[in-house]
Amino acid sequence: MRVVVSGTHASGKSTLVSDLAAACPPAEVLPDPFELVDDAAAEPDASTFVEQLYVAAARLEEVSGPGRLVVAERGPLDLLAYLDALVELGRPTADPAAADDARETVARAMDGVDLVLVLDPDDVPEPEDEDPDLRAAMHEALLALLDDPDLVGGATVVDVAGPRRSRLEQALRAIGEADSRRPGNVGPPT
């Protein structure tokens, strides 16, 4: 089962992924693509988001196998939302051809995702040094993209909100429900 924890920056993704890994051993954790991009700028820009999008997509397409639980911190849809947010904010973004290619890549990668857990950024204090305008615009763009069945594929989308413990409980419940609908399921999370 492939689970993507999605949300804008500073929304609690790392915390939830860590909590899920502890609650569901031996879950395989895929870290934030930001950590895997060598030239990630201090202030991410369109080229950084595009590179992270391709990293996020490739790793989702590479993981497979029955009985495996894979939890990805941020998926390619998140990075596409950042590109859309840059447009909304009037900031430099990817050229139209690159954006179209990115959408196709997202659709292919998301086709294999079973569950998307979407975090509510309002549950985490907004850090002033984290570009609050981009944070808000990305969240709105992500919600719009999650309504596009061509991009989400067959993934179940579940909003996760509240304090840390409640988020973990909601995520575990969503994983259990999504897994029960899959043939050859991995069993309920512990």
Predicted features and spans:
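Conserved substrate/cofactor phosphate-moiety recognition/catalytic segment
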Residues: 15-61
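Conserved glycine(s) of the Walker
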Residues: 12
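A glycine- and Lys/Arg-enriched "phosphate-lid" helix/loop adjacent to the NTP-binding pocket
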Residues: 86-162, 179, 185-189
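The conserved Walker
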Residues: 9
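Short loop/turn segments at strand-loop or loop-helix junctions that form parts
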Residues: 32-33, 73-76, 82-83, 117-123
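Hydrophobic anchor at the beta1->P-loop junction of P-loop NTPases
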Residues: 5
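Pre-Walker A (Motif I) flank of P-loop NTPase domains
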Residues: 1-2
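Glycine-rich phosphate-binding loop used to anchor ATP phosphates in small-molecule kinases
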Residues: 48-111
